[in-house]
């Protein structure tokens, strides 16, 4: 297991299941801030005493667990790997079904109304902790295909046509 995933697992173990996704979202916000001020990463990573400055800046905006985790990364000189750690943390959340990755494939872009309906279905089935990615795939021929944490729900016409072909071929072999 790579080092960044070990840190991601340690972070998950130090949070409650209820807080785990909120911590992920806060880490994303922190990286957005670091992207605006990239010089801070190098400064913090090589002068860890400067972390108190970061702590005072983020104190009102970021949970202590996130600040503590960032400080550990800084002390271990891994802050420059923050994006990889966050990606590994996302994967750990998905593996533990605390965060749901939903990929929606359709033959054409879904209308806002269809997207809203789909979001309602997703939230009723899996809750509010999800990431959704809409993709256009002309091969679907209509309908939609959902992938949720690797599981596939395929209601596309292409899937139905393939099923009919298999049934006809199976029937012809009898």
What are the functions of these language-model segments?
Residues 1-174:
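Elongated, mostly alpha-helical coiled-coil "stalk/stator" tethers of large membrane protein machines
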């Amino acid at each position: 297991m790579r080092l960044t995933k070990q840190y991601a697992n340690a972070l998950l173990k130090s949070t409650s299941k209820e807080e785990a996704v909120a911590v992920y979202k806060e880490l994303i916000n922190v990286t957005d801030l670091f992207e605006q001020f990239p010089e801070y990463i190098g400064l913090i990573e090589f002068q860890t005493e400067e972390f108190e400055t970061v702590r005072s800046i983020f104190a009102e905006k970021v949970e202590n667990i996130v600040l503590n985790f960032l400080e550990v990364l800084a002390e271990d000189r891994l802050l420059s790997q923050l994006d990889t750690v966050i990606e590994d943390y996302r994967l750990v959340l998905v593996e533990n079904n605390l965060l749901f990755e939903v990929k929606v494939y359709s033959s054409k872009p879904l209308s806002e109304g269809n997207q809203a309906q789909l979001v309602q279905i997703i939230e009723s089935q899996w809750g509010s902790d999800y990431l959704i990615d809409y993709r256009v795939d002309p091969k679907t021929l209509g309908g939609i295909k959902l992938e949720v944490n690797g599981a596939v729900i395929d209601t596309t016409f292409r899937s139905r046509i393939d099923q009919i072909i298999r049934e006809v071929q199976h029937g012809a072999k009898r």
